[in-house]
Amino acid sequence: DLHSFPTRRSSDLLNNQMSSQKKISRPSEDPVVAIRALRLRSNLSEINQYYEKNIPDADAWLNVTETALENMKTILSDIRTQCTYGASDQLKAEDRKTILTQLESLRKQIYSEGNSDHAGRTVFTGYRTNCKLTFMEDESNTEYNIQQKFSYEDIGEHRYYDGQVELKTAEEMSQKVTTSDTKQYTYDRIRLAYGNIGSLKDKDGNEIAVGKTGTLSYHYTDNTGAAKTGDLNVTVYETEDDWKKAVKAGNMPEDGAAFIKSTGELVLGNEASETLKQSKASIELNYDKKGFNSGEVRPEYYFNCTDITDAKNKITYEKYDANGNEIYQDIDYIIAVNQTLTVNTNASDVFNADIGRDVDEMINAVKAAIDANDKVDKIKDMMSQAAYSGVSAQENLQ
């Protein structure tokens, strides 16, 4: 019966759909439905990818980051606690040594949190997730050329001391000894991210030799909005003691600066400092450094730099573009349709390169206090010894 054929066909189709749980068995049965099914399957696959993989992975990445930052906060809090405790005048020698031990231990932990990883991918190193933030061991032969930018806001006051007491022998103490009081010098400075600098380059890229004076350029905007450039004369010294000798000899010009290689400091004369601050200037220091200690941050995560360890295979890293804008290495996860989430945090945004240097200076200050205390105890002991019982010796010891 021709009239019953469509009914039987419809009935067969419905029976097939019920038994197979599928609207169509083959695309040719209904191309429109087939296309819609494929689109639905694709959308469902994407949603499953978001739900089962991307969102949990992003959440885990953020949790690792949060934990690392919380640990860093705890470490800095512990450092502050040690500093507060060390400010007491009632401390004994053993107490200061305990503080020193604690600070040295905390110093090692500071940037270790920056090496935190999720599933083997370091979370603070941008796209280089297979690399660590810090040097994992001492690398005495590794050498970088670094361009580190500073603004006038990076200028800070620092106190320098000279005239350390050197204990003499009993024979020397029996004679009249001329002693000098400890002197304090207060200067503004710009401190580099590293000490033990190999060489500083002048504005033309040429090395300024130790004991010689070169010229650096600084940049500022005048009252009319025009970009201007100024010159700063800088004399290079190998050590802080060498620079102090120059200061005592009157060789620290008010309108110039001194660069100390061992400490990585640009010490500014008073006039030079005022000029930079009043003009709200910026200055870039171009320097080479060879040899990095375990735990120091790698320059490529903070500055424009070039790994020049192998002269035939130099590796250039760009942290800032030609206009001085930071180049971000964001890792984005797709967590929904047309929705992305940046999961990583750049080390330069949360692990300031100055933190380690600050703690190093604290450690040096504690060591100096311990050394001074030991000398006082030694002098007291010497005063009670027969070898130092003479009038001249007693006067010198006092």
Predicted regions and their residues:
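A generic structural signal for short, non-catalytic loop/turn and secondary-structure boundary residues
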Residues: 117, 185, 209-211, 252, ...
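Short flexible/disordered coil segments
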Residues: 83-94, 147-162, 191-209, 321
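Polar, glycine-rich mid-to-C-terminal structural blocks
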Residues: 142-189
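Polar, low-complexity export/assembly segments characteristic of proteins
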Residues: 8-11, 15-18, 22, 137-161, ...
